[in-house]
Design a protein with these regions (language model features):
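Helix-to-loop junctions at the C-terminal end of transmembrane segments
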Residues: 27-41, 125
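Short amphipathic helix-loop junctions that connect adjacent transmembrane helices
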Residues: 1-13
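Transmembrane alpha-helical segments of major facilitator superfamily
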Residues: 16-25, 106, 110, 141
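C-terminal ends and interior cores of transmembrane alpha-helices
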Residues: 49-63
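Small-residue hotspots at the loop-to-helix junctions and early N-terminal turns
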Residues: 11-19, 100, 104, 135
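A membrane-interface helix-boundary motif in multi-pass transporters
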Residues: 10-13, 42, 119-143
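Multi-pass alpha-helical transporter architecture, strongest
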Residues: 58-59, 137-172
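Substrate-agnostic recognition of the 12-TM MFS/MFS-like secondary transporter fold
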Residues: 29, 70-121
């Protein structure tokens, strides 16, 4: 809907922008796989807050020459965020329930979130919110959720310091 309103794109033209996001995501994921270490994975949480706020910037973009690099940047941030978060979830899940079950639970939750966010967006537009309004609400929801996760993690580092340090020691010692 955004590409149609902001850029005057058809669905077919807008599908090319998905490819731009995918290229950015792949580049960000590759960078994260080289740069990030498991014991520092939670350090990317602020990127999620930034991504949510950056998404709101889409409402000011009306030129594909600006949109394409912007969407590639968003994809890059997403790729850089998701690799360490997935690695952390899989590592913790492996220690709790085994690798196969951990990955299955993680994939289920990811797909459920995709479905839920799609329904959230569809609901907003169905009840008359413009594409720009829905993007703003979505961006604020992502940034707000990531801020809650950041605070929860900070609280856990204080309340459960010994357990967090134990888990970090395991993460530092694992060589995968």
């Amino acid at each position: 809907a955004w590409a149609a309103v902001a850029l005057g794109y058809t669905t077919t033209q807008a599908s090319g922008l998905v490819g731009v996001v995918a290229i950015g995501t792949a580049a960000g994921a590759l960078a994260a796989s080289v740069i990030m270490k498991l014991d520092r994975a939670t350090g990317v949480i602020p990127l999620g807050i930034g991504m949510g706020l950056l998404v709101i910037g889409m409402i000011a973009i009306h030129d594909v020459r600006v949109a394409a690099p912007f969407l590639a940047l968003l994809g890059g941030l997403g790729g850089y965020l998701v690799v360490p978060m997935n690695a952390l979830l899989q590592h913790r899940g492996h220690n709790l329930m085994g690798a196969g079950r951990s990955i299955a639970v993680q994939n289920f939750n990811e797909q459920a979130c995709i479905l839920g966010l799609g329904a959230f967006y569809a609901g907003m537009t169905r009840f008359g919110l413009s594409a720009f309004g829905a993007i703003t609400v979505f961006g604020l929801a992502v940034a707000g959720t990531m801020e809650l996760i950041r605070r929860w993690h900070a609280r856990n580092r204080v309340r459960h310091q010994d357990e967090v340090e134990r888990l970090l020691a395991i993460a530092r010692s694992d060589k995968h």
